[in-house]
């Protein structure tokens, strides 16, 4: 498919007429590149270049005009929402119904969602325009003619277009190439935080009101219960994409960037790590806001709290100073003019705060850190996480053992640097210990500092610096953390060309298996949103953490190609000289993402065949070769196998997902995954077991079977019980015999239960129950058809139809018709049940069932003919 058609397919349908006219610019470029110097009829080269520049300039002006108007429209709506929040905050202290206030919040939240959705569409629109322009520039650079009559080079001409007034400054200072939507993202996130805090404030105000209402007189309470205020327990969830959080406990567990980063590297379970295309960063951020995630930013959190704290001051300031406030910024300016305390901060600044990671290792491991060879250390290495804007830091030490690692965030960065500097200077151990004790650290912090001291750890190169955007969402008691790391710089030398998206979960249950991760509803919703919005991303293997990727690529000369080789080495066979383009790499990532999480992306023919346009042939590694390289589980002398010798390679463990051992959930899942039932009629396992037990009880009742054979252990127990024992030794022996008997009985019960739960026993019971059902249906159908046939013959053949005079003739005919139809349904169900067995039935079952089927069918047809004709 042509590139211009791909632009139309990817663009927003309502805005497709505002896209860059790719076809028009391509024709202008083609005239320049196809210039024939030998043809005197062709126009001059300079004229063609001017025409091409004018065409570019016109398209830039059109796109810039639309973007300028759209961003101003969104800004106006955001200011209107902020003004509504200010008015709402001013009226909170007045007497008003909480249900009415919550409804107002819901309406404001709907407008916020509209603004966020418009920003997401605008982000997608800008990405499409930038891709189209980059494609056009690439075409110019590759096909630009060079001749003595045209001394201008391709790069110079493209640079002149890039530096044009319409592209640099845009329309009224807004250019689609330079427009940054991050400030709008922070502003929307601030509004969402204020709405959450206002909702929590309303809920807190409702609780004492309910207590006071319970102390009122009975007539007043009766009147109150009938009023709308009594039914304000909760409003239905907002149908919009940005929900109002009602769970205050989960939303306040992590309320700072420091706590977020601590939880991210400490107790959070990894759900997935992805390499994201740089073009989809802004769109992904707005999409996360749409599906209920909130941004964790210290400036936003502090601003939200201070806005709520100013409610009383706003009310006391008078209408004169508040009347003209149209936004949070105007409100702060108005309050400063009235010489009040500077209680509201200025606009939420998008000042770039970078996160730094310094890896700690022992002396001599600078060239090959331990985390490159040990995956346990790789997941929780010795490192220091700090921020450029704060003096606090996070220290993590891999101590091993049951604790595995310790993490602390109550140390100052300068104190940790002083200790590391003292160790490098060769200070005495006692002096360093005294320095540690002088800090008065917490127990965990002291363990971390003493670990650094005892193992003589020091910072190694390279140092990692990156910009981090944090998102959080609470769902069913679980907290989901998303970290988007951009501009990852490796030792101030090189920068990763793509950001890394990391998704983790603070779960109530630890140790998530891969099956549990893939079945996580929130994570699955997130992955579906990524595929639906056509974001380009690729799943990173779990063993490749951000710091390991950077350490692997620290000496790379071709960073992008080596990064692709590193991420694909476990799934695909690539030669060292193979070079993938970003589109090819992310297409492979999309295929794996859909396969890994059982997702189906939108049908997009614009992508074309992946293999058809690929410059490098890629062969996927077979899973069999991967399984062969895995180590077999270690067997010990006291392990016994009760399975067949050829089952699971004589392994004691049930080895699933390539792990050394399995959890109880995985074993139960493996046992539940029985061979599928392909019968015509399917039954639940519970129904089969209950029906079989009922049939057994009925059979025993008919045969008058009784349990006449006592247990072997019960017979052997009576002689010991009948004999008289004296003394403590005899008494102890009697008690131990009784205890061992109970243990054996319980063991036999468990063993019997395991046997009954096995697949072979279930198949046997299934066939027995199905046999009982189809034989019963066969017998019932034959009896009903025979009785109906006798009645029909006696009524319609015994005498003439005109002589039949019965008062209940119509009722009798209806009963006969219904009985014939029921017998036909039963005989059909009999055949379906016959072919629903796991094993083949005896041959006489098939002969008898088919014979009776044709007989009953003929009887039904004959009866219907006699009745109606």
Swiss-Prot record:
Matching InterPro entries: SPX_dom, VTC_Complex_Subunit
Region (Disordered): 205-242, 599-629
Bias type Polar residues, positions: 223-236
Gene name of the encoded protein: VTC5
Gene Ontology biological-process entries: intracellular phosphate ion homeostasis; polyphosphate biosynthetic process
Domain SPX: 1-154
Tree of life domain: Eukaryota
Annotated GO CC locations: endoplasmic reticulum; fungal-type vacuole membrane; vacuolar transporter chaperone complex
Topological domains annotated Cytoplasmic: 1-771, 832-848
Name under which the protein is recorded: Vacuole transporter chaperone complex subunit 5
Major subcellular site: membrane
Subunit-structure text: The VTC core complex is an integral membrane heterooligomer composed of the catalytic subunit VTC4 and the accessory subunits VTC1, VTC2 and VTC3. The complex exists in 2 different sub-complexes: VTC1-VTC2-VCT4 and VCT1-VTC3-VTC4. The VCT1-VTC3-VTC4 subcomplex is mostly found on the vacuolar membrane. The VTC1-VTC2-VCT4 subcomplex is observed in the cell periphery, probably ER and nuclear envelope, but localizes to the vacuole under phosphate starvation. Each subunit contains 3 transmembrane helices. VTC1 is a small membrane protein without hydrophilic domain.
Side Vacuolar, residues: 793-810
Organism: Saccharomyces cerevisiae (strain ATCC 204508 / S288c)
UniProt KW keywords: Membrane, Phosphoprotein, Transmembrane, Transmembrane helix, Vacuole
Transmembrane segments annotated in the record for this chain: 772-792, 811-831, 849-869
Phosphoserine: modified positions: 238, 241, 316, 324, 327, 609, 612, 668, 760
Protein localization: Vacuole membrane
CDD domains for this protein: SPX_YDR089W
Membrane topology: Multi-pass membrane protein
Function: Regulatory subunit of the vacuolar transporter chaperone (VTC) complex. The VTC complex acts as a vacuolar polyphosphate polymerase that catalyzes the synthesis of inorganic polyphosphate (polyP) via transfer of phosphate from ATP to a growing polyP chain, releasing ADP. VTC exposes its catalytic domain VTC4 to the cytosol, where the growing polyP chain winds through a tunnel-shaped pocket, integrating cytoplasmic polymer synthesis with polyP membrane translocation.
Further comment: Present with 172 molecules/cell in log phase SD medium.
